[in-house]
Amino acid sequence: MKKTLLASSLAVGLGIVAGNAGHEAHASEADLNKASLAQMAQSNDQTLNQKPIEAGAYNYTFDYEGFTYHFESDGTHFAWNYHATGANGANMSAQAPATNNVEPSAVQANQVQSQEVEAPQNAQTQQPQASTSNNSQVTATPTESKASEGSSVNVNAHLKQIAQRESGGNIHAVNPTSGAAGKYQFLQSTWDSVAPAKYKGVSPANAPESVQDAAAVKLYNTGGAGHWVTA
């Protein structure tokens, strides 16, 4: 799910897609249209999620009107994000095969948030979306299951990463803007579709960690990470 609150201020999304390898560029050498890029980032312009801002490798960071913007590409994958200048917003990255289409990531205000876009190996039918945000880098694919701390439910490595970037592992986290809640930042409608009868209609943040873990595993098994990211 999207948009977990971790600190004050604003940080927003990134888009990652496969591109073409090229030269390495640096912000100090670039003649960037900062105003245009800032406006595109603030409005979550889909162009930023569909293609890099230029061919080849580049790594640009600049401040503009109270926000810090970052655009990067290794020539194959590209990413972008922004946050209020001085806020502790982390740069995000992910990998997506060239054959996949990546839809724009969501944009949310209020507190330090950032967002990533991941694409599964094979195209899947879009499942109910959950809001997402995080301050950690995620590139791994789930490889093993292991019981999470404070719970006897086996949670795979990918779900643990999702929980970490959604809420920092806080089972009581609540996003007052989107209403997403709990360790995995479930929206209420999504939670009610996978929660035990006893907890339907109850905020995910009020459910025990083991119940939240079990619901997340159930949701993940029906559609993978697509429940938490737009991919």
From Swiss-Prot:
Induction: Positively regulated by sigma B factor. Residues 93-152 are annotated as: Disordered. One of its GO terms (cellular component) is extracellular region. It is found in: Secreted. Residues 119-137 have a biased composition (Low complexity). Its main location: secreted. Keywords: Glycosidase, Hydrolase, Secreted, Signal. Pfam families: Transglycosylas (PF06737). Its EC number is 3.2.-.-. Residues 1-27 form the signal peptide. Residues 93-116, 138-152 have a biased composition (Polar residues). Is able to cleave peptidoglycan and affects clumping and separation of bacterial cells. This is Probable transglycosylase SceD. The gene is sceD.
